[in-house]
A protein has these predicted regions:
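N-terminal low-complexity, acidic/polar interaction/targeting segments
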Residues: 1-86
Length: 86
């Protein structure tokens, strides 16, 4: 994924976590660092910040392609955003 895509995903993750905190989840907004030199590590950093089930984490780990992992995480975050705003 591009740096812009990672930054957009980061923004969406912050929205999701903020909504979950408003609904009673006891956690703080994480600090993110998007490393333009190592986008793979940045994507994994984003993955670790999103509250998700063990099944979802395993699904992310099962993908061999970094692009597939990005798409899976992005779709997951978008799904949460859509459910929360409906």
């Amino acid at each position: 994924p591009s740096v812009e895509e990672l930054l957009q995903l980061q923004s969406n993750i912050k929205k999701v976590i903020s909504m979950l905190i408003e609904q009673g989840l006891d956690m703080q907004l994480p600090d993110f660092e998007i490393d333009t030199e190592s986008r793979i590590i940045s994507l994994w950093n984003l993955c670790t910040k999103v509250p998700m089930s063990i099944e979802m984490r395993n699904k992310l780990l099962s993908h061999n392609s970094i692009d597939d992992r990005f798409e899976e995480l992005n779709n997951y975050v978008q799904l949460i955003l859509k459910k929360s705003f409906n």
